Amino acid sequence: MTGSQSENNTSTSSNSSEDTNNDSRNESETNADKNVVETKTTSDNNNKMMNAAETAANEEKNGRQKKEKSKTPSKEDKKSRKKKSESSSESSSSSDSDSSESSSSSSDGEVSTSSGSSSDSEKVKSKVKNKSKSPSAQREVVQKETVTDTPDNISKETQEKLVEDIPKENELNVNLAKEDSVNAKQNDTEASNENVAEEITKPPQKQPDTEEGEITENNEKNSSARSPSKEKQLSANRSRSRERRSHSGDSRGAHSGDKGSPSRLKRSPSRSKKSPSRSKRSVSRNRSSSRHGRDSSRNRRSVSGDKENQLRRKSRSRSSRSRSRSRSRSRSRRPERKHRSRTPRRSRSRERRHERRRSVSSDYDARRRSRRSESIERRREERKRRHAERDEREKSKRSRRDEDDSFKTNKVSAEMEKDKENDNATVTDPKAKITERQRKTVDILTSRTGGAYIPPAKLRMMQAEITDKASAAYQRIAWEALKKSIHGYINKVNVDNIAIITRELLKENIVRGRGLLCRSIIQAQAASPTFTHVYAALVAIINSKFPNIGELLLKRLVIQFKRAFRRNDKTVCLSSSRFIAHLVNQRVAHEILALEILTLLVESPTDDSVEVAIAFLKECGMKLTEVSSKGIGAIFEMLKNILHEGKLDKRVQYMIEVVFQVRKDGFKDHQSVIESLELVEEDDQFTHLLMLDDATSPEDVLNAFKFDEQYEANEEKYKGLSKEILGSDASDSDGSSGSGSDSDSESSDSDEDKNEGDEKPTAGDIIDNTETNLIALRRTIYLTINSSLDYEECAHKLMKMQLKPGQEIELCHMFLDCCAEQRTYEKFYGLLAQRFCNINKSYIEPFEEIFKDTYQTTHRLDTNRLRNVSKFFAHLLFTDAISWDVLDCIKLNEDDTTSSSRIFIKILFQELAEYMGLGQLNKKLKDEVLAESLAGLFPKDNPRNTRFSINFFTSIGLGGLTDELRQFLKNAPKSVPAINAEILANKPVDVSNSSSSSSSSSSSTSSSSSSSSSSSESSASSSSSDSSSDSSSDSEVDKKKRKGKVKKTKKKKTSNKKEKTKKSKSKNKKDAKKKAKKRKSKKGSTSSEDDSSKSESSSSESKSSDSSDSEQSGNDKSKKKTKSKSKTKPNKKSKRSDSEDVENERDIKRKKREDFGNYIHEDRRRDEEYSKNGGRDRKKDNHGNNKEKREIPQRRDSEIERRREEREKRHRERERNFSRSRSRSRGGSGRKDRDRRETNGRSERKDRERDRDSDHRRYRKDYDRSRSRDRNEKREREYSRSKLRNTSKERG
């Protein structure tokens, strides 16, 4: 019985092992790619553990079989064993091909409890594996046999120890046998149920050794053909195969022991001691392997035609072989060490539990595997189907694209023609055909939200394309423009520009966009609650003209407040209630609405509601006390009760106390309306009596675009309405009010503007002369300049301001003003102005105009500002930022310049010389292009102006610039003074008569000389024609005198020589008398009064001039006489000439002394006048005296030169006449006389020239001395005067 039971157990265990093998294979096949690494590690560990267990189990089973054979040997058992060995040899190949997988399954705790004859089946399997050339299996068997079977070489001591351990093992085996019998019965019932369902096939036949795939298929067929009636025979065959395997194992073990190392032999006793635990593990191993084999046969039968699974199995088997080869024999100890602590009972119970679970779930596993295979096939089919559908879709898309392209190419020309015809087709007409381009614009513009963002350039293009104002696209563009303009104006509004913003808003069509206006105002107020009073004032102005807009905004605010109150949104409640409070202050809303809101907030008090009520009271408390004192009194009583109850937070209670204090102060810090925002009169305002319950609909439809069929008519109506409201201002913005009008509308609006511009403004128009925009511009420029680090950054910021045309000059004025305000000149401003002139030429002309205006108004600038301004313009000039032609406004003379302008010119040219250098500046000023512009700076029209210019530039240290002027002044023709009319009227007089009558007529000549001097001053600027006429008249008079003299000389030659000597003596006496008289007159003049000083000086000058003339004429005559008598009396001549020279020198010294005394006297007189008049008229007197002093030497020089020229002319004419007369009288016989005359003429000429040169030299020396003395005195006077001025300024 025990044998049959063991055979049944082995069969069931083999079936169960086949099932488990199939499960593990299916799982590993489906998850092959994922769990390759895991299966390798687990299979290695499990093989190590199971090898040790199998060796112990084989030893136990061999002992049991020997006992059973000795008890019940029979023929039937032998036959059954033979059959079983044959069948097992065939089936072992299939089961052993999956040995690696069975080992992994057994390691997870799925170990069967069947014991008995599983070791025999393992031996048979090992033989078949050896035949089928499976090296991994052979290595496992060799390891087992080496561990279990003791070789001949082992010592007797070790054998005796093994014999002592056998009875202990037998006791354990008896208990195991009992437990296995129970489990075997259960496995037999399960196996019978499974075998009934299997098909009966032919009995198994031995097959030749082939590849693993073929062996496994045949084994599956043979295992499926088994029947329950032959199980006993199989068990007998298995027992026989066990015996054979044991013998062969002994021989192999001995053989391997011979080959093995001595270390293994030493370890064998320790292994034999641990055999019981190994036997248990080997039993579980055999059972699990049989179960895996059965399951794998079923799975292979279902998926026999799948080639992919075969390839996977081949790769798996090869990997398992490689792993088994790589294992070392020494690793079998590790699982033993791990499981030393486990008791045999515990391990048995665990194996039983796993076996029960496995047996119950075998059917479920089979079903699951079948479902899994079906699902895999289903997925494959679905994948194929999806790929096919995708390919079809792509083909259809390609075909559609080709069709669309062909359609487009065919109909492009047709669409182009239809565009022109249907361009103005409106969207309202459903029958109208519109183009693709128009459809796109309509799609973008007619959506509710406005569609995507359209850039301004594209929007203008779209607007230009749409020519029909009644179309939806055009109205949509106008709507978007209206929305942007309203939103922009609302964001710009403040206390200062509220009037301007209101006018601009009224120019827009706010009746059409009233929803947009109310929404933007509410949004702006919520974003900036501090400007609530400004928005309320704006609403009040609009409400006075359009009450429906004010009512709509008030409705929306009340609805917003109610919603926020229901939602407990404190921030929205605060903002909306604050706006309503200011609307109550502006009389847009009635006070009943405010009282209703307060009662709503206070009747059910919470911390938030009371806080909102207090904020509301602060804003409109003053107005409510004026309008309804009882109502606000009731509100404050309710607040007092809330405060006494003390249920609220301490913070809120403190706020209530603060409100009572504010009320006590009369809301002085919370005024209802400030003065600058009281823009609407009380009679013009429209107050809305709106209650909390009345506000129901916010009319949000007005916020969205709506097509208007009468768009043009409504726009014209609103234009007329805005003109009535605004007056003439509305006509200025007709073109921009629509903000979406095309070129036709703009041209018509401009025509209207022109017609209305001709009309005179009405009396009610307001003209803003405060120049607020100009002030704001100057403020921004000033702040930008002061906030910049360098001039480049400042220029960049100012260029980004985008100034309007005409504002460039304001920018230039700001540059100059900022520069003038500095304590010292900063180059920053010059560089900034230069940069603007270089960037844009439009700034050059404003700077040139500012230069001219500044030069004309230099007297208004103080010294510091004058210095900075002149240096600023010097920088612009030397950098050529502005033209040098601006210097034509400067006229450098005494009359056209002031002290401020001279200082301006001085600093300007000194700065230019510092920047450019004197040579470069001189070169620039000599440029022919600038000659006309610099004519005022370097005047050549009048010597007086020329000298002033030379003296000015010399005084400022730039005399090198006046070299050309100095040269011009030297080479210029000197003006000849006009000759007195009395002198011209007189007849020519003899020399003797003129000399005798000179003393008697001294007074008359002095007066005539003074008159001639005055006339010469007045006629200094006369024309050249007058001077030429005067000179011609003088030459005629000289000719007449010369003729008379020639006649007299002829007569005198015939007269006696005695008369000549008498005349000469009489002349000398007369000259001495004249000199004495002159001395007396000069002494008298020094003691005379101040009024007669001028006349006496002029008379002395005239006398000196006349005396010099008479002396020169007398000297000439005396020289002639002495020369004629030189042969006879040479000593007299030399004495006379010496005496005359001494007398002349004395006369000159006397004149200088007298002049010096006159000058001193005049200076004293001027100082006295200056002290009397307070220094006012001193400049004028000095100027006049200086003029006279300058003109006196000029007159002298001119007169002396004129007289010399006249003398030379007379001598020449006389000599010519004399030579002619002599030639006529004597003819050719008077050659000797002619030679004598020529020699005499030459000697006379030499004498004359010598005398003239000596006189000239003496005169020049005297003149230079007097001039240097005058200059020194002048400097001393100026220095003393400057001291007086400085001291007076310092004293105040």
From Swiss-Prot:
It is found in: Nucleus speckle. Keywords: mRNA processing, mRNA splicing, Nucleus. Residues 483-666 form the MIF4G domain. PROSITE patterns: MI (PS51366). This is Pre-mRNA-splicing factor CWC22 homolog. Gene3D superfamilies: 1.25.40.180. Residues 264-291, 312-357, 1040-1083, 1118-1135 have a biased composition (Basic residues). The keyword Transmembrane helix does not apply. Residues 1-19, 45-56, 88-119, 727-742, 992-1034, 1095-1113 have a biased composition (Low complexity). It comes from the Eukaryota. Component of the spliceosome C complex. One of its GO terms (cellular component) is catalytic step 2 spliceosome. Its main location: nucleus. One of its GO terms (biological process) is mRNA splicing, via spliceosome. Residues 743-756 have a biased composition (Acidic residues). SMART domains: MA3 (SM00544), MIF4G (SM00543). The keyword Nucleus applies. Residues 183-195 have a biased composition (Polar residues). Required for pre-mRNA splicing and for exon-junction complex (EJC) assembly. Hinders eIF4AIII from non-specifically binding RNA and escorts it to the splicing machinery to promote EJC assembly on mature mRNAs. Disruption phenotype: Early lethality in both males and females.
